[in-house]
From Swiss-Prot:
Gene: gatA
Catalysis: reaction(s): L-glutamyl-tRNA(Gln) + L-glutamine + ATP + H2O = L-glutaminyl-tRNA(Gln) + L-glutamate + ADP + phosphate + H(+)
Active site: K75 (charge relay system), S150 (charge relay system), S174 (acyl-ester intermediate)
Protein name as catalogued: Glutamyl-tRNA(Gln) amidotransferase subunit A
Quaternary state and interactors: Heterotrimer of A, B and C subunits.
GO BP annotation list: translation
Family recorded in the similarity comment: Belongs to the amidase family. GatA subfamily.
Molecular function terms from GO: ATP binding; glutaminyl-tRNA synthase (glutamine-hydrolyzing) activity
This protein's UniProt keywords: ATP-binding, Ligase, Nucleotide-binding, Protein biosynthesis
Gene3D superfamilies per UniProt: Amidase signature (AS) domain
Length: 509
């Protein structure tokens, strides 16, 4: 059952108040935070204020929406007016934005209760949340492992029930990869469906804000609250927003699902491949037609991304110079101040990407690197377009392996390979969702479902059908009973219904 729906029912029947729910989640957050370190800033005072406002509306007989009174965590690269927004960087350690991001403003207007700002890789550059300047977030399933990144704090907070849902950002997999590592659902929407106004930019043509939740329905409800045109974002799409809850039908008979052959081969771990193949077979048992799809340009996705994204980052991060806001190091000249401020303010990974991007954009190498990468990006988009002429959605593993040990991947290339399967979706601007499809040695494995432009409803429908016929999403990390189950007195730790690891029947395409 959707956690949002269950809590909403308790609120409207006055079984519990929004303040009671907020206090329970804040208590659990505080209890687990020394172990997990999911949050950079906890906004207890704001949360209780927002919860009391919802209770006042209920007492006045006002009808509340499904998001009212629901505890929310926000990735700390989304600007929140009057609340510290650091991007997990020394550069913005004390920065308090004078304005609010569109997505957080919309959710506040819907009555959501913000419990805090979550940890991330510095400026959203990383795949493990180890690049934060302040702390390393732990994976709730195994505290010695990473939660993924860059939205690792948001994923860990939802997995550990420190919040019901969370916001993240996804530039090359930063919602889907940590969702897979932490055993929750994460969605990167179509580029332009959700406003980026107030999201601190990493790579502007790739960044997208999206939701985390325990269930597909929770993610659909949060997406409903943030999707839609925003005149403050020049890349925002002017399209009609459907009711995503209407897509949640556990019936996919006749759906054509493409299996991306290129992402199930070399580079994919054996346990991950087995779990995803079992999930594909299960989708076939639900009535879907399975086709194998070739996307040959995907093999160049990683190289393409690591030219385009750092190039955009080198431009976007030029604004952090110590002049208008953020860190400023004293120096004898303006040029020296720039150098000292950026040397102290940025961490190693951010500096690395700025250097790569500056090199790719330099006069002698622009055509050889940046321009060529943009051409390959077009080829990747064309591969997707050809695939969607034959199928409704595509599926693949979300990550090559389950979560790895903290400190295990110090080599940048081995870290970059974590996003091998998610990057093509960002380069094409498509919607992609990760949901749990199995476990290996007690660690979650994610199934990625990819849709065509603005086809979030199809992605959600396939994800919902799979979720409702399995029990993977009901498993909980070994961290004690979460607030909702305490209130209901029903702790659950079921086994999944679908255990088959045999390959599915496929027709070649």
């Amino acid at each position: 059952m959707s956690v949002i729906r269950a809590l909403h029912r308790q609120l409207v029947t006055k079984e519990r108040s929004a303040e009671e729910i907020a206090r329970e989640y804040l208590e659990r957050l505080a209890q687990l935070e020394p172990q997990l370190k999911s949050f950079i800033t906890v906004t207890e005072e704001l949360a209780l204020q927002q919860a009391k406002a919802v209770d006042a509306r209920i007492r006045a007989g006002e009808e509340i929406g499904p998001l009212a009174g629901i505890p929310l965590a926000v990735k700390d690269n989304l600007c929140t007016q009057g609340i510290r927004t650091t991007c997990a960087s020394r550069m913005l350690e004390g920065f308090i934005p004078p304005y609010e991001s569109t997505v957080t403003a919309r959710l506040a207007a819907a009555g959501m209760v913000t419990v805090g700002k979550t940890n991330l890789d510095e400026f959203a550059m990383g795949s493990s949340t180890e690049n934060s300047a302040f702390q390393r977030t732990a994976n709730p399933w195994d505290l010695t492992r990473v939660p993924g990144g860059s939205s690792g704090g948001s994923a860990a907070a939802v997995a550990a029930d420190q919040a019901v849902v969370a916001l993240g950002s996804d530039t090359g997999g930063s919602i889907r990869q940590p969702a897979a590592f932490c055993g929750v659902v994460g969605l990167k929407p179509t580029y332009g469906l959700v406003s980026r106004y107030g999201l601190v930019a990493f790579a502007s043509s790739l960044d997208q804000v999206g939701p985390f939740g325990r269930t597909v329905e929770d993610v659909a409800l949060l997406l409903q609250g943030i999707a839609g045109h925003d005149p403050l974002d020049s890349t925002s799409l002017k399209v009609e927003i459907p009711d995503y809850s209407q897509a949640l039908i556990p019936e996919i008979k006749g759906f054509k699902i493409g299996v991306i052959r290129d992402l199930l081969g070399e580079g994919c771990g054996e346990e991950t491949r087995a779990a995803v193949q079992a999930a594909i077979q299960h989708l076939e048992e639900l009535g879907a037609e399975i086709l194998e799809i070739d996307c040959p340009s995907f093999r160049y996705g990683l190289a393409t991304y690591y030219i385009i994204a750092p190039s955009e980052a080198s431009s976007n991060l030029a604004r952090y110079d110590g002049v208008k806001y953020g860190l400023r190091e004293p120096a004898d000249s303006l040029l020296a101040m720039y150098g000292k401020t950026r040397a102290r303010g940025f961490g190693p990974e951010v500096k690395r990407r700025i250097m790569i991007g500056t090199y790719a954009l330099s006069a002698g190498y622009y055509d050889a690197y940046y321009l060529k990468a943009q051409k390959v990006r077009t080829l990747i988009k064309q591969d997707f377009l050809r695939a969607f002429e034959k199928v409704d959605v595509l599926v693949s593993p979300t990550t090559p392996t389950p979560a790895f040990k903290a400190g295990e991947r110090e080599d940048p290339l081995s870290m970059y390979l974590c996003d091998l399967m998610t990057i093509p979706v960002n380069l094409a601007g498509l919607p992609g969702l990760s949901l749990p499809c199995g476990f290996a040695n007690g660690l979650p494995i994610g199934l990625q479902i990819i849709g065509n432009v603005l086809q979030e409803s199809k992605v959600l429908r396939v994800a919902y059908a799979y979720e409702q016929s399995t029990d993977w999403h009901k498993r909980r990390p070994p961290l004690g009973q979460p607030p909702l189950e305490q209130a209901q007195g029903t702790a659950q730790q079921p086994k999944a219904k679908s255990k088959s690891t045999k390959g599915s029947k496929k027709s070649k395409s």
